[in-house]
């Protein structure tokens, strides 16, 4: 294992780190609205660090670019995921809402996603022409014509429908240029282990959110964990997605990218889905 290969100097920047509570999540605009709609409420332990060395910043960017290039080169990808959305109640109690699911991608224009949590059982399919979102337990669905690529779909969901795909930024054709231009601070934090996989641990800061990513070391540098923490709303809300059972190419099971709507399901508009959203209505902020 390479846990000892990282320079001990990288840890000098965090040896005096103090735990602090950041201001937590707000609904963000533009590129981060995708995540804001997923992350909506709170809790995260923020970490204050000393400035990283330039060499560490360059190394972090190189590792992130290698992951971005690797992801872009994969025509077929599938993985399972576990996600946790932290919320804060009006009484200040912090609660985590856990979900699990699957994601199957066929570039440039197909996605099949499932997600099951305590409040929702959702299936989502995009075939390059139409996007269908089915709430199985609520027996409702949305179907919209959205022709184009995965990149165009993510933008459309973000800007028009405010409906995110898990790890949406990581599905884009150029992850590096989705995130890096917004980063005001970049760090290589050394090694970490996620589900037995040794990873490079990177941290980025933008004007509105803090990002952490753990990237598998070796010839398949896929994202093992992705964490988003807000700086702007009291309570430091955090959204975490853990990736497992990563497969590419011929390992990926065949998928029709077709989602038949069951008889009796009610058609809704994209703005009328409180029962199948990741954040259930009982936790929605009061107006």
Language-model region placement:
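Gly/Pro-enriched, hydrophobic low-complexity segments
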Residues: 57-58, 82-84, 132-133, 142, ...
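Bacterial N-terminal signal peptides that target proteins for export
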Residues: 7-39
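Flexible, processing/modification-adjacent segments and terminal tails
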Residues: 55-63, 72, 91, 134-199, ...
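Bacterial N-terminal signal peptides
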Residues: 37-48
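A short, polar/proline- and glycine-enriched secondary-structure boundary/capping micro-motif
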Residues: 90, 122-126, 135, 143-146, ...
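N-terminal mature ectodomain segment of secretory-pathway/periplasmic proteins
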Residues: 58-140, 221
């Amino acid at each position: 294992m390479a846990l000892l290969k990282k320079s001990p100097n990288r840890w000098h920047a965090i040896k005096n780190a103090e735990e602090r509570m950041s201001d937590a999540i707000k609904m963000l605009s533009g590129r981060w609205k995708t995540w804001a709609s997923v992350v909506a409420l709170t809790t995260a332990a923020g970490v204050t660090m000393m400035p990283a060395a330039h060499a560490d910043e360059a190394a972090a960017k190189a590792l992130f670019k290698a992951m971005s290039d690797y992801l872009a080169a994969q025509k077929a990808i599938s993985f399972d995921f576990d996600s946790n959305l932290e919320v804060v109640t009006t009484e200040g109690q912090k609660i985590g809402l856990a979900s699990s699911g699957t994601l199957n991608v066929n570039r440039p224009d197909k996605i099949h996603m499932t997600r099951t949590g305590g409040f929702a059982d959702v299936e989502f399919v995009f075939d390059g022409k139409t996007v269908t979102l089915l709430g199985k337990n609520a027996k409702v669905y949305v179907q919209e014509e959205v022709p184009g690529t995965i990149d165009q779909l993510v933008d459309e969901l973000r800007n028009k429908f405010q409906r995110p795909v898990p790890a949406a930024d990581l599905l884009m054709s150029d992850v590096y240029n989705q995130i890096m231009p917004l980063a005001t601070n970049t760090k290589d934090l050394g090694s970490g282990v996620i589900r037995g996989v040794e990873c490079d641990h990177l941290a980025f800061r933008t004007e509105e959110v803090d990002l952490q990513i753990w990237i598998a070391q070796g010839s398949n540098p896929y994202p093992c964990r992705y964490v988003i923490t807000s700086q702007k709303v009291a309570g430091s809300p955090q959204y975490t997605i853990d990736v497992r059972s990563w497969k590419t190419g011929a390992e990926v099971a065949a998928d029709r990218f077709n989602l038949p709507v069951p008889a009796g399901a009610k058609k809704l508009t994209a703005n009328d889905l409180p029962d199948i959203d990741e954040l259930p209505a009982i936790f929605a902020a009061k107006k």
